[in-house]
Amino acid sequence: MQNIIHITQSNELSISNNQLLILEDEREIKISLNDILAIIVENCHCRISAILQLRLAENNIPLIICNEKHQPTLHSIALYNHFHLTVRINEQINWNINKKKELWSKIIENKINNQRNLLKHLSKSELSVARLETYRKNVLENVDGSDQQEAIASRIYFQEIYGDKFKRFEDDGVNSALNYGYMVLRAIISSKIVAKGFHPSLGINHHSQFNSYNLSDDIIEVFRPIVDYVVYY
């Protein structure tokens, strides 16, 4: 099982024999790169060796650095990590529009299903669980209406988990925790996308010219309930 390494106190990060070397005052901690899913650095004064950054890129391990407010602000991503890079990106550019609609519908269906399963796992309202199942089925029946079904389902879902007064994107502790978790998840997904030879800016449904992670933001939808679950506890 791979772990997310959270750095808050360490003075320096380096590498030794394919192991992350954490230097903290007089202590040395070593962790095999094979056991690392991602590294989050919250100490802005931590020194990170260039050779470590190269090895992390080679192993598709995102390095996420937070600002002074502890918000994930920067993450590393490998540039050329696939032997058929040009072929994959050309395929991605030419993805069929109808196929993308079908894929997006499948993503939303799975997202709502995962939300429903989490509500059920947390023993939330049976009525809300049933309503999300209805919206999931509606997505299957009407591909073009998936975004509307997602919006309704998400409103019910979030208020069921975090309370009737909860509103997404407001400036509060729960939203800050959700945003933090989503940013970490987004960085991990982006590294996996690049490892497969695709480009994270070329999305399935997201297509903003100002967003470098459109495809990451498509794929993350299915996995958001993982973060929601962690924040709930």
Residue spans for each PLM region:
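Short hydrophobic alpha-helical runs that function as membrane-insertion/retention elements
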Residues: 21, 39-41, 61-67, 71
